[in-house]
Amino acid sequence: NPEFIRFFYACQYAGLIPVALPASVKVGAHCAYVAQLKQLLEASDAEIGMASEGYLSFLQEASEGLSMRMVDAPEAFHALPFDVQPLHQAEPDDISYIQYTSGSTRFPRGVVIKHRTAMANLHGIVSHGLEMSGSDRMMSWLPFYHDMGLVGFVLVPMAAQISIDYLDTREFAMRPRQWLSLMTKTRATISFAPSFGYDLCARRVRASDIATYDLSNWRVA
């Protein structure tokens, strides 16, 4: 959702600390998901919550009983009265954002990322890891709450000032061949994912589709 990116960077400008919460991936796990969200809201001392239409009801239910100032959809925030405020001057040791671990072996743990750490990491990725140039273009289907999705495909393209195209994670899960179709269409040079993503895509590709793909520009995978 593009609103996530707008709100994430708005928090940076305003001196607020954004925390990306995980999306529900299990069917029929409503209660467990809401309970997890509530624990994350409490652990992060969240005061304001924003969610797109598909997840807003979960977030509002999870926030019940908590002293949060506002939990609503992006449209509600955009409708708030405009007020001129001086921008916060970020310092290197200020907190940039909090990243929660996947929680595959235990409850997700919050990792505090400071601006100094974030910028050093981005410099290393852009200049040395990916060796990026102005001719690069990125493409991703990874969720923004995932470290690889947030750092690799939200922060990196902004830091490097290059274009990026996004495919909704759910769309990829249902039709993984779209990844290759969009790589062909956009001529993207950089797109990477966990190994299961390549496996899922390879298992869904049909022999008759192969001739329609042109991945010759894809240099980092």
Feature map (PLM): residue ranges:
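Conserved pre-ATP/AMP-binding loop-to-beta segment of ANL
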Residues: 80-107, 117, 121, 129-137
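Conserved AMP-binding/adenylation subdomain of ANL enzymes
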Residues: 119-137, 147-189, 200, 204-208
